[in-house]
């Protein structure tokens, strides 16, 4: 199912998902450094593999994904299938509601 068919996202639920599943490797605050994964500030509308100061896999650079709700929704289902060769070890979020919630949180927190 595509993002067009996704349930409405709840950014408060997404905040919990981010803290539990993403925050050990990612930050969202402007000016915050990179961790194991890149800082996600300014994520929406950015091309994959382009955050300054972070060493991306060739796969991430070459895929040239434009990050928006629809691409994140597909990517977060199974990152290694969406970008084979990505360094991201996270297996993905199988539930559409979890992905929609996380995207709602990211849309607000990374702007």
From Swiss-Prot:
Positions contributing to heme c binding: 22, 25-26, 88
Cross-referenced Gene3D superfamilies: Cytochrome c-like domain
Modified residues (N6,N6,N6-trimethyllysine): 80, 94
GO cellular component: mitochondrial intermembrane space
Record's keyword annotation contains Heme: yes
Modified residues (N-acetylalanine): 1
One GO molecular-function entry: electron transfer activity
Pfam families: Cytochrom_C (PF00034)
Domain of life: Eukaryota
Entry annotated with the keyword Heme: yes
Post-translational note: Binds 1 heme c group covalently per subunit.
Cellular compartments annotated: Mitochondrion intermembrane space
Keyword terms: Acetylation, Electron transport, Heme, Iron, Metal-binding, Methylation, Mitochondrion, Respiratory chain, Transport
Family: Belongs to the cytochrome c family.
Protein name, entry field: Cytochrome c
Organism lineage string: Eukaryota, Viridiplantae, Streptophyta, Embryophyta, Tracheophyta
